[in-house]
Amino acid sequence: MQRELNRRQFLQLGALAALGAGCSSARSDALSYSVLVLGDVHFDAPDIGVYHAHYKPKAGSVAAKIFPMRMKREHDQWSGLMQRLAAAARKDIRPDTKFVLQLGDLIQGNCAKAAIHAKMLEDGFGYFKKTVSPDLPFVPIVGNHDVDGSIWLDKKPVREVYRETMLPKLSQELGQSIGNPTFAFRQGPDLFLCVDFNFPDCPRILHLLEDNPDVRYTFIVSHGAVVPVCGGSHFRWFLLGKKKDEVVRRKLYSELCRRRAIALVGHNHQTVFADLVTPEGRLTQFMATSVWEAEKQAAAQPRQTTPEGYAKIPKKAKDYDADEARALFGEYRPHLTDFFLSGQQGRCRLDVADAAVTMTMFGGDRAEPSRTFVLRDASAGLA
């Protein structure tokens, strides 16, 4: 049964959270807070020439086929829809909001030159910092488009362009030295572990978990899903999703379940909630998207609302044949207790307290929430 709140239940949980925070205002600030969450945003300019004038994908390649479609999408989004979403997100910030978290794909990429790619990162960060988060830390994690375009630009790895441009900004925003796209920070008693899903470093991830054993909630933040949820041909785009990584993937999954972690992810341009209970513990995943592709996507209706709708197996996919795909999803399907999937696009608010952790979804630039998901509810024994 999907744990979605009606208005009365939401108010009751809010009251419990306030009581659980204690009498001291300092303790309340530490234990009860909110985070504004943006999914993929694909910052771009309506004019293709601003960032993409030099990008010429090889004739006949997949990139050449999808590039015109991508550019039409970017033009449509950044001709008004994304500006409206950003303005609405600014209004979502409350006195208890501690920071703004962006789940990767800050920019579109496809720049062809290192200097232009760096400028796009600078401009994308600057736009959301100024428009949404001028007075709070703005924390974008790395997505595939943030290092997109090609492996090298001007004889320089794109990932190095990203590191040189973004890590100093993250260090300034968080007030700590960030020297790697996989990093961790604390918000009160909670751990936010942000990972580079493009180049996953499992030993580093496990080390950061080991260094923070005494936390209330563990949030693992990844652009790609921690638990694969898409049955399309590109479902391999999840954390440690290559077949060669299956041993470390299972090890990390087991550790996250043991810690009863909450995964905050993006990439698929969908809203997805998945809750899994295993012999080791529990892992809850929420996938968000802020790529507002069309007006109607602000009110998109659910496509799946039960575990039976999880992960339709594709006929073929890169890295996996059909039997291998069935085996992969078969590792997760028996543990799934709740599942929800929608094409709705917008922004989210994460509310964290002793009594509960909830995620509230707002479609497009709408002021009224569409639904609230319960990620943890201590009062119901679901912590």
Question: For each of these PLM feature ranges, what is it?
Answer:
Residues R27-A115:
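N-terminal active-site segment of His-dependent metallophosphoesterases
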Residues M1-A18:
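N-terminal secretory signal peptides and thylakoid transit peptides that target proteins
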Residues K58-G60, A64, G109-Y217, W237-R260, ...:
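Extended active-site neighborhood of metal-dependent phosphoesterases/phosphodiesterases
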Residues Y33-V35, F43-G49, C202-I205, V229, ...:
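Short, solvent-exposed loop/turn elements at domain surfaces
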Residues D214-S233:
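Short acidic, glycine-rich surface-loop motifs adjacent to enzyme active sites
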Residues Q102, N110-H117, L121, L276-Q285, ...:
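C-terminal/domain-terminus segments
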